[in-house]
């Protein structure tokens, strides 16, 4: 059963609330099941942060359901250039988010369910949560062969991944979140989670590719709504709480004071890209010049998402050394992103001799450089 989460039926989840108590009026004795009415990845991730930072979960576990419009979510210690096709994401208007938990990269859309299990640090148990999901799936379709693995994934028929896991453990609280593939766009998923960038050297956490499958392909009755209700029922029975899914608005400051600032932080370039572990790119590409292919070599060091070292090598007869040196020096300290590179190269182009052939070569080189960003 869905219940709107409004000021008239708010819940006091803390005995010693660390935020203004205006957002929560009544006391929850055993636990709570929430569902976001938002499909914005940043707003929903902010709910996780808020609950983790502000709620006393002693004896009051929380299950949080949320779904996002098409988005790619990378782990806390991952490199987006290594994990996904950023150029395709920009073309398609797909959001990129970096979560605060570890783990690998996932694709979200409205055919995917996200589940977050909040507990105290002492009660944190990923395997128990996954077993709960398996029981819920078997309750609605006993013929399903779903098993939890040692890597805390859920496999369908022993080979198809339908759920991936990540977690965050704080000083006193913890959460485990996972996906559940119902009717996700598999073609889009595989295209977006395939990096086209070559020559990346990084110590960032790398995702492990897996075969995936939607539950709806196995049984067309297994819709997102059916699955969420099944998991909620099993969760309520396990924790002996009311089987009610309470709808929340993750932008409501009366319920979650300060939550919008958390969502804004998650959208910043400094968080999404700037938190990428230091990496380098050592690659090359070819350009056509007078019916022959010339090789352009590129070596770039990136730290905190900004170019620290830049060395672009091209034949002198194709592009003068002086111009290449200007390009190398101008990019140092800039964001490793096509928008800022476009701005810098346009400014630099104005200082170059107004020569049609030279400008054409310059544009070709700059487009190639932006293509690896």
Curated annotation (Swiss-Prot):
Residues annotated for (R)-lipoyl-5'-AMP binding in this entry: 107, 151, 161, 179
Transit peptide location: 1-25
Compartments reported by the entry: Mitochondrion
EC supergroup of this enzyme: transferase
Tissue and organ distribution: Highly expressed in skeletal muscle and heart, moderately in kidney and pancreas, and detected at lower levels in liver, brain, placenta and lung.
Coiled-coil residue spans: none
Reaction catalyzed: N(6)-[(R)-lipoyl]-L-lysyl-[glycine-cleavage complex H protein] + L-lysyl-[lipoyl-carrier protein] = L-lysyl-[glycine-cleavage complex H protein] + N(6)-[(R)-lipoyl]-L-lysyl-[lipoyl-carrier protein]; (R)-lipoyl-5'-AMP + L-lysyl-[lipoyl-carrier protein] = N(6)-[(R)-lipoyl]-L-lysyl-[lipoyl-carrier protein] + AMP + 2 H(+)
Disulphide bridges, residue numbers: none
SUPFAM superfamilies: Class II aaRS and biotin synthetases
CDD domains per the UniProt record, alphabetical: LplA
Main location: mitochondrion
Keywords attached to this entry: Acyltransferase, Disease variant, Mitochondrion, Transferase, Transit peptide
PROSITE patterns per record: BPL_LPL_CATALYTIC
Molecular function GO labels: lipoyltransferase activity; N-acyltransferase activity
Domain named BPL/LPL catalytic: residues: 57-243
Biological role stated in the UniProt entry: Lipoyl amidotransferase that catalyzes the transfer of lipoyl moieties from lipoyl-protein H of the glycine cleavage system (lipoyl-GCSH) to E2 subunits of the pyruvate dehydrogenase complex (PDCE2). Unable to catalyze the transfer of octanoyl from octanoyl-GCSH to PDCE2. In vitro, it is also able to catalyze the transfer of the lipoyl group from lipoyl-AMP to the specific lysine residue of lipoyl domains of lipoate-dependent enzymes but this reaction may not be physiologically relevant.
Disease per UniProt entry: Lipoyltransferase 1 deficiency: An autosomal recessive disorder due to a defect in lipoic acid metabolism, resulting in severe lactic acidosis and metabolic decompensation. Variable clinical manifestations include delayed psychomotor development, severe hypotonia, dystonia, loss of head control, coma, bradycardia, and pulmonary hypertension.
Similarity remark: Belongs to the LplA family.
Record protein name field: Lipoyl amidotransferase LIPT1, mitochondrial
The organism of origin for this protein: Homo sapiens
Gene it is expressed from: LIPT1
